[in-house]
């Protein structure tokens, strides 16, 4: 699988998960409509489906995906929630992305 394609798929997967978790947060913590649970469930279903599109084992896919998820969550924090990530947030995301790259690019038997 093309590395750029895989990374893009990880990003889409992370966005689907963040949306699926953020909408219930809005309902539970900010008093928004419980109807937000409907698109949240749909988003989480898309998230699970996107994970199946990766060609490697589920556990390895999910482990590598974690690094991208961290970076996407920080972008979400900045763009949607209006809170700029700290230097330490960015360093942590970089370490996570490096970990993801090691998992994805590492040699296989």
From Swiss-Prot:
Subcellular location, record wording: Cell inner membrane
Entry keyword set: Cell inner membrane, Cell membrane, Membrane, Transmembrane, Transmembrane helix
Pfam families, sorted: UPF0060
Cited InterPro entries: UPF0060
Segments traversing the membrane: 3-23, 33-53, 62-82, 87-107
The UniProt record lists the keyword Transit peptide: no
GO cellular component labels: plasma membrane
Domain of life: Bacteria
Main location (coarse class): membrane
Family statement: Belongs to the UPF0060 family.
Protein's name according to its UniProt entry: UPF0060 membrane protein MXAN_4406
Natural source organism: Myxococcus xanthus (strain DK1622)
Organism phylogeny: Bacteria, Pseudomonadati, Myxococcota, Myxococcia, Myxococcales
């Amino acid at each position: 699988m093309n590395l750029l394609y895989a990374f893009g798929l990880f990003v889409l997967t992370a966005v689907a998960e963040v949306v699926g978790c953020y909408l219930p947060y809005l309902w539970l913590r900010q008093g928004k409509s419980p109807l937000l649970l409907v698109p949240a469930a749909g988003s989480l279903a898309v998230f699970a489906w996107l994970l199946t599109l990766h060609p490697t084992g589920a556990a390895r896919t999910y482990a590598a995906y974690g690094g991208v998820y961290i970076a996407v969550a920080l972008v979400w924090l900045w763009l949607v929630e209006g809170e700029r990530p700290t230097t330490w947030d960015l360093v942590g995301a970089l370490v996570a992305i490096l970990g993801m790259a090691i998992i994805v690019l590492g040699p296989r038997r």
